[in-house]
Amino acid sequence: VAGNSGPTSGQEITWEEITEHAKSPEPIVEITTATKRKRRVFTFGEKDFRKAININRPTKLMLSFVDYLKYDDRHKTSWDSLTQETKDWITTLESKMNVFFNFLSTGPNPEHTIIRKTNGELAVKAQIGQ
């Protein structure tokens, strides 16, 4: 989002804060396609997430931008290879929201996807497009 997109339960933060929190050696930033401005970014909005879950009743969930939590998780392809801090954050969120993330995105490409079984164990490495 580059402009005002309405209310959100997340708190607006800066790309610099994300870069610092993730301990990234390089700046993390997203630019909008049309205006070429920095995309607005927010903390995870638990209230919005819960509302979306209640309205949509999804059967599978994907959590994107896991690599924005910790740069060390960038391009990981297995649950076991994620940092303990990231795994703890995800499992705490899952428990709190009573959900399970079947897919975790750790980078910009399809192969940077972790597919999990419902018991939280790694199912298979994503083989998208093969």
Where are these regions (language model features)?
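Non-transmembrane, aqueous-exposed alpha-helical and coiled segments at domain scale
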Residues: V1-Q130
